[in-house]
A protein has these predicted regions:
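Structured loop/turn residues at beta-strand edges in well-structured enzyme cores
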Residues: 37, 102, 125
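PLP-dependent aminotransferase-like
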Residues: 57-111, 115
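Conserved PLP-binding active-site segment in aminotransferase class I/II-type PLP enzymes
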Residues: 1-60, 81
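Hydrophobic transmembrane signal anchors and adjacent membrane-proximal interface regions, especially
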Residues: 2-12, 68, 79, 98-102, ...
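Conserved active-site segment immediately N-terminal to the catalytic lysine
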Residues: 105-133
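Short acidic donor-binding loop at the edge of a beta-strand
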Residues: 41, 63, 128-129
Length: 133
């Protein structure tokens, strides 16, 4: 066997990360975000891209319409989650939220460029998911 990078094989015990994932600071941050945007729940992830990916991962695979002027990480997350991407010519969303996908019971709102007080109460229903970055 050829080892190109000469890197040792390590096993990572993910239990070691528990204090980083369930930290009181993260919980306080999530609570403050809820209070600020008017949402009932919040879940912190390391990026909005990962939130999009996780949100779409278990959904029925379909084509998702997204603005054509968007960072490439967004279509990448959609495709990696198993969906197809359809780019639309919509520049009105720039700097604002837009509906990433509307399902029967709820919608996913990509709000990576906007974070306003009471925004969730104004733009979403309790069952909706709004992604901030």
């Amino acid at each position: 066997m050829i080892k190109l990078l000469h890197v040792n094989d390590y096993k990572v015990n993910t239990a070691d990360f528990s204090p980083l994932l369930n930290d009181p600071i993260v919980e306080r941050f999530e609570k403050q975000i809820c209070e600020f945007v008017g949402a009932k729940y919040a879940c912190s992830l390391h990026s909005a891209t990962m939130a999009i990916f996780f949100t779409l991962l278990e959904q029925e695979k379909q084509t998702i319409d997204i603005p054509s002027i968007i960072p490439p990480v967004v279509p990448n997350a959609i495709i990696t989650a198993g969906h197809k991407v359809n780019f639309i010519d919509n520049v009105d969303w720039v700097g604002n939220s837009y509906v990433l996908k509307k399902f029967d019971d709820y919608k996913i709102i990509d709000s990576a460029q906007q974070l306003d007080e009471n925004q969730f109460k104004q733009q979403a229903k309790d069952e909706d998911l709004m992604i901030f970055s």
